[in-house]
Amino acid sequence: MKKLLCVFFCVMLAALSAVVFTGGKDTQKNYIKYVEFNVTKDALQNAVDLDIQTHDDDRHTDCITMLAYLGAKYGGDFTKYKYSDMIDFADKIKNGETVENLTKDMKYFNYYSQAYGAALSGIVGDYEKETSKGTEKDYGLCWFSPIAKSFPYSCYDDFGAVRTYGYTRPHLGHDLMAAVGTPVVAVESGTVEIMGWNRYGGWRIGIRSADKKRYWYYAHLRQNRPFAENLKEGDKVCAGDVIGYVGRTGYSDTENTNGITESHLHLGLELVFDESQKESNNEIWIDVGAITSVVEQNQSEVVRNNETKEFTRKYKFTVGND
């Protein structure tokens, strides 16, 4: 009996060791596995505006901290949002209180800081841009509308709606309805990770942010000439660069097929807290409706080359240390 108990104990100890350590490293990674991004357009716009307005103050409060505070206060339910709550928090910071003290009793403040930080890091910051009058440096909105300036479009907010092609699944993106050939620009600077055909998204591009937390997915691009000229996987793009053109490709196993009824850009945003999440059954895609509404005020002006019929951005734009 003693021998049996000894064997059982040894087996359990070995199993526990296998769970906790692999090559001396902790395998129980502590990273976020679920995010529901319910920040409203008004809340995001107010937070961005306050961030910019207070940037030069001694007690600057960034938009992510403000939204994380409200997320913890509301339990993530931004239908409860009141501008006065945001102003109250910003005023307390301005008057000398610390974020640590104001959030010490908020159990989930750190969670919302990480979640909203992953979703929004870099949306505002230092930038340098060319204009018709020269070059200017400032602090402000650094992300761009995915549709180039002067091209008409409308948004169709159906995140989570049912899609049935291939299999029944939720729609994990935001659709921007526009004419075929409308220039698509990078919302945020990053590296092109994927370019090519996908039976669902058609011709598509995937761009990863510099901090690796955000994977932007642009799908249903134009038939025959979907991508910006000479763009390839591994290239770095700047926010506002032309990366492709609106189309209606996809919903087909046959490459270069127009399987979508109405031309539009499918814009998706995946949050990545651990690389194991990137292509898995546990991917985190968030609703970018509020984000696209806020960044539409920052559209990239483009020019057309009449010989190649390609569009490129008119004015150079540099974010931070790009």
Roles of regions detected by a PLM:
Residues 181, 210-212, 223, 270-274:
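Solvent-exposed coil/turn segments that connect beta secondary-structure elements
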Residues 187-230, 254-262:
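Zn2+-dependent peptidoglycan hydrolase active-site motif and core
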Residues 180, 196, 241, 247-250, ...:
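Sec/Tat-exported extracytoplasmic proteins
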Residues 204-207, 237-256:
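Short hydrophobic beta/alpha edge segments that flank linear recognition/processing sites
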